[in-house]
């Protein structure tokens, strides 16, 4: 690592973190836009929120611009198109259950014919404003609820009685779109995962005329779904296990590891297993995102020194040199030193200081690159689009998810498992009671 980076990173990161948090006022000249794809399941979920959002937008942002693309962007993280589509269907089903979106029990990708019919309906309709958004929601419902008969009827009417319309707030493009997103003030917000952040921003700038009520079952950081002592004991007795696959040069890895260790592991009696991954250039990250996550989770952050490939390798070496039963605490200390104390573990003096703090008289002779490559392979087998990858095992079931946007699933899964357990027990009790009544 260069001397400039080692010296300047801690200073710059501390300044960035401590600078006044007054939000810049984002420009409104371009209004608010939403980018959708008819064959994108996240767009289906997003479309269900648009009529309500339009209703509370100030006149300054009306009408909401709807940009519909017919081109999918390349799948992330080297996933195949089929893997990505299946991941999206599974993930959207989880989101729909959590936030009570409309969703089919057995979702399927819409057919090419249905997509073509839907596009004609939306291009030809004379409806505008909120009326168009309700039609858009209905069309998405027909596509994703497999209501192809209704869609054909609407298509026939649109083809015979309407002509192609041209409205500035309704645009059809072939610009690649991976998943639905909003654009405001030259910033992008995920269509579902960032909707609350977007509405907070709009409310802050006094661009909403009413209180936004979206994602009512959203689980906030440091908010526990389970607080009843009896229910908590039941989860703890199930001995949940959580695997984390993390990139050591990524600050999100530190923030989520610290959050899970400090806030969830002891509370729910979760056994953690950590799998460091080989360096993948994630030290080039969004400083603003990491800072926001730190402040929302309450996890310490900065001054840091972004690890390069050699520093990440040395972090893994230290981790592997510690006895297995001490490795969770050891990696916590290693990442804490890098991300809150500004240590550069590619620098000999810093490395030796960390080695001494961990009480290591000698280092592991293990092939670290081979160890990391094996972790990489197991991580890739999970077919997830982003890092960190998490796998939760509980009550004989395994649940795989990823990234800071899905940490809430840990609490949600616990709650769902308990709910299902109580349903089964209640059904068994009713059956027993009915049998006894029949005998009597």
Predicted regions and their residues:
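Structural alpha/beta surface segment adjacent to cysteine/selenocysteine redox centers
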Residues: 38, 42-142, 254-341, 421, ...
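Residue-level preference for long, well-ordered alpha-helices that form the structural scaffold
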Residues: 81-84, 88, 160, 249, ...
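Short pre-active-site segment immediately N-terminal to redox-active cysteine/selenocysteine motifs
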Residues: 36-39, 246-249
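A broadly tuned preference for mixed-charge, low-complexity surface segments
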Residues: 86-94, 231-241, 296-297, 372-375
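Aromatic-acidic/polar surface patches that form glycan- and anion
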Residues: 172, 187-188, 249, 308-311
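An acidic- and aromatic-residue-enriched active-site/binding cleft used to recognize and process polar
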Residues: 66-69, 194, 247, 277, ...
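C-terminal cap of thioredoxin/glutaredoxin-like
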Residues: 3-7, 11-14, 28-34, 43-56, ...
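Short boundary motifs at domain starts and secondary-structure transition points
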Residues: 20-27, 230-238
